[in-house]
Structures are given as C-alpha cells and as structure tokens.
Amino acid sequence: PERAGLGGALGDIGTHAFHLASYVSGLAIERLAADLQSFGDGRALDDNAHVLLQYEGGARGMLWCSQVAPGHENGLRLRLFGDKGGLDWQQEQPNVLRYTRHGEATRLITRNGAGSDAASAAASRVPAGHPEGYIEAFANIYSDAAALIRAAQGKGEKPDAVLPGIEDGVEGVAFVDACVRSARSNGAFVALRR
C-alpha cells in the first residue's frame, strides 16, 4: 500500500472499467457501494472487487474486477442496457459489438464494417476483417496527443481528438477512494469526493 496506494485490482484494472463505463454512457457516478476481497495469502490490497454504482439521473450499474478469475484473460466487458435496447462489447473479441434493440434480433456490428461511422473509420488502421485492437488503441492515443502538442506549438491544426485528461485521472482516484471507504464501512453507499 505504501507504493501502490489504496487499491489493488481496483486501482490496477477497476479504474479502467469505471472510466470506460462513464465515457461510453456519458454519465457520472454519484454514489457507490463496494465489497473488496483479498484471496491471496499475505496480500494487503484487494485482488477482487464488486461495486454497485448509482449514476446521475437514476441509472444503475455493477462493476466486477478480479485478478483471481481463472479462465478470464483481461476479460474486460461492457454491457449497457437502456430504454431503447442494449450494447455488449468484450475486449477478448474487440472487433464485435452486439447491439439489441427492444423487440428485435441482436445485430453484430464489426469494427470498421458496413454501417460504421466516421469516428470508427478514423480509429481503425486496417480494413474490416483484420485483427486490430489493444496496441492500435494506444497508437491512436499517442498520435492524437502528438498532434495536439504540434497544434499547441503552432505547427498544425488542432485535431478532433478524444483523449483522457487530468479530470479523468482525478475521477479514477476518487473512484478508488470511494470504493475503499465503502468497503471499510461494510459496503455502505458513499458519494465520490470530487
């Protein structure tokens, strides 16, 4: 804890799931309730976490992050359900987004495939059907960051980039802090300190 901070799996991988859910939904978390566990002998920090989320406007969510789940290799998964339908995306199958409108059959939307929009095309580096994902996502971030730096130096136009900022980092720290406070209060709901 002296070097890693308050969160184990929560700080390592949970913050990414938290940020992804907030970014994709466009919603901010108001309160959460967390149950943190450590299954490894002698571990001071969590290696498994279950978190109930209450978003602004009444939306609800659940987050599970674990570093002790055999058979799941960085199994980041995001599911969103609303009044119009649902979305389901898994990092282990990153080129496919499952989209289901209420009362209709599920559609599989492929990365940069038919019906993709301009944002999808801009983020894709190879044609549809070729594997692409994790490393290319970092390349997109670095490329956008470099373009923003060049623009700030007057050496180009400011790109239409979507990058995480300091606010996202602060929000991630507030998320870990709230989870630890909740767990220490027997899983009581607590507000994020912003």
Segments and roles (model prediction):
Residues 5-10, 127-134, 158-166:
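Active-site rim elements
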Residues 1-43, 49-53, 97, 122, ...:
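Predominantly a Rossmann-like dinucleotide-binding segment in NAD(P)-dependent oxidoreductases
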Residues 8-11, 15-19, 136-143, 167-177:
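A structural signal for well-ordered alpha-helical segments within the folded catalytic domains
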Residues 36-46, 56-140:
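NAD(P)-dinucleotide binding in Rossmann-like oxidoreductases
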